Amino acid sequence: MNAIKRFGSAMIVPVLMFAFFGIVLGFATLFKNPTIMGGLADQQTFWFKFWSVIESGGWVIFTHMEIVFVVGLPLSLAKKAPGHAALAALMGYLMFNTFINAILTQWPHTFGANLKKGVENTTGLKSIAGIETLDTNILGAIIISGIITWIHNRYYSKRLPEMLGVFQGLTFVVTISFFVMLPVAAITCVVWPTICLLYTSP
């Protein structure tokens, strides 16, 4: 029960920011509406361009929602050094998507995903932090963040031999995550397209 409560609290951390950015988008849309603002909202005016810039900033949390959840969850779920846990989760998520990109690049026909067409022209793909990868959306982010947080909680305080002391703490967590993310990425390449087909089929 305590674990469920902690997970619920962790999920709330990123969600709480949605309200602010939603308000920003609401004001930007309102002030760019010619019906309300008249000629002031003409596309060539400074007013329109200014609120277009504000609007672009308002979309940041929704455009990068996966990264927000990946970083946000460990801040509440890590038993110690939550900052290091968040950084490890971010690194793990980037490695996960980079491995997926490399696998799909090397075996495009096996997994039915051609990255050469670009993410805009291919269903089920997305660019995350500049990495073309499978669109595992929030679910993928939560799973990867959970795995990395578990690794962090288990191995962050692990004492290594003195000659390997430089690899303790955060570095050790990231090292383990590197080798864990490779099979996780491979499994995702096999399983996720099937899940997408089941989800999108009528």
Map each language-model feature to its residues.
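Early transmembrane hairpin of solute transport permeases
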Residues: I4-Q168
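Duplex nucleic acid-engaging cores and interfaces of nucleic-acid transaction enzymes
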Residues: F172
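Alpha-helical transmembrane segments and immediately membrane-proximal extracytoplasmic
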Residues: N153, T175-F178
